[in-house]
């Protein structure tokens, strides 16, 4: 319970991580040391409460090496001066070698965050970072990433000699929201590996007399059964019939008439 689902993404499962303003640093070893190429990561993020003390700039997550304080693809957060917040990306210490996304996010909103750290060989300050916030679901699983929300920042800041772990962190009440939730952390070498698309379950029809049951498995939550009077041109909307659980399936009973009704599952 409490998982953060991202529409179009593979279903969330297992536990999520919740933290508050209490200072902490959770460093997760990757099991390898990367010194070349690219590293991608993704996770779902929801801020449940900002808190009255949250007035500064904080760091939520990113990649690093060992127990040091030099970071790469660092996900930053700040209040927008109203009732929401903004996310940014930077490399090294502070936020000088980075940028802020223009998006204003609200408390309770689930955000899909994708980051990348790219090793460049020319100098000790030329590695770059990129950030995607809520990328279009049509890009999930693609070979080539879509255009980034923040593209290729970090040049000029100190490079990481290697990347061997991912971290989540909290600083203090002034730099960390009062309550945050993250879920479905994925780390890989390609965009596709951290944006696996949801597999649409099969929709079955079982008829009996003048009624029929539409069935799909309960292990594929997050899908909405929609209907339309035409496949191509008419709008789609959620069915009005109640959805019930029938064993290992969700089930909707419909009356069979002479009117055309088309059905689909949408995540």
Where are these regions (language model features)?
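Short tryptophan-centered beta-strand motifs in secreted/extracellular beta-sheet-rich domains
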Residues: 41-43, 108-122, 129-133
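Short, aromatic/His-centered strand-loop micro-motif at the edge of beta-sheets
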Residues: 88-112, 119
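Short strand-edge motifs at loop-to-beta-strand transitions and within beta-strands
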Residues: 26, 111, 248-252
